[in-house]
């Protein structure tokens, strides 16, 4: 209290802050609204540039036919492992296997590592050596298989043919936690104050937090595949 009652020196701000530019390959989800909201930016000039990468001719999206088991069912793990084995066999290695949980990563590693090594593929597992060493060995080998979780979804770049396949086990929705739950409660209150009602209010946090965050993570993970115009 004594400190709060001390006289303050008035500070006059006479200089206009310089412009700030935010640049990223993954900010738009699909527009800039979520990023601006999270940063507290009320107004800004935005631009979404066309990608220089030829995804249509240089990449292919594979989604397994038919309905998969729910990720919370025991059958999902074996279904996932079977799909991974088929795809890695087809690509002959050069694969990032990106998992949304350590449990799925460990299950896949235990089931597939021996088979892949018998095929002559180098298997690298997150946690068995430093991240930089794993990335270097993957690039140098050319036909390796990486088993990894969130830390390899971003910040790792493998160019050319050393990486030919990226597999993501399931949609990377954020798990409940104190901070994430608090953000959802805040969004619910915000929506209610804006007059949102009924099911629109019920789904507002999911549509405006869960989905944008998941979309950003998915773009980060899938973005490991095409890194240059040569890929």
Question: For the regions a protein language model found, what residue spans apply to each?
Answer:
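ASCE RecA-like P-loop NTPase motor cores
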Residues: 1-231
């Amino acid at each position: 209290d004594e400190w709060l009652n001390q006289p303050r020196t008035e500070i006059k701000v006479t200089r206009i802050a310089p412009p700030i530019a935010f640049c990223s390959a993954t900010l738009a989800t699909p527009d800039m609204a979520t990023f601006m909201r999270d940063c507290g930016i009320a107004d800004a000039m935005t631009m979404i540039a066309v990608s220089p990468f030829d995804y249509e001719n240089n990449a292919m999206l594979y989604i397994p036919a038919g309905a998969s088991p729910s990720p919370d069912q025991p059958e999902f793990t074996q279904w996932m492992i079977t799909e991974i084995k088929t795809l890695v066999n087809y690509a002959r290695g050069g694969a990032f296997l990106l998992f949304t949980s350590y449990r799925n990563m460990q299950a896949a590693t235990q089931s597939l590592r021996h088979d892949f090594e018998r095929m002559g593929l180098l298997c690298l597992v997150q946690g068995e050596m430093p991240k930089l060493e794993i990335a270097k060995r993957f690039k140098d080998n050319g036909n390796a298989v990486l088993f990894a979780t969130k830390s390899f979804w971003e910040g790792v770049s493998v160019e050319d043919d050393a990486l030919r396949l990226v597999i993501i086990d399931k949609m990377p929705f954020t798990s409940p936690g104190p901070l994430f739950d608090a953000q959802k409660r805040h969004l619910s209150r915000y929506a209610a104050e804006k007059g949102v009602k009924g099911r629109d209010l019920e789904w507002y946090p999911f549509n405006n937090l869960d989905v944008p965050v998941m979309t950003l993570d998915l773009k980060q993970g899938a973005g490991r595949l095409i890194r240059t115009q040569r890929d």
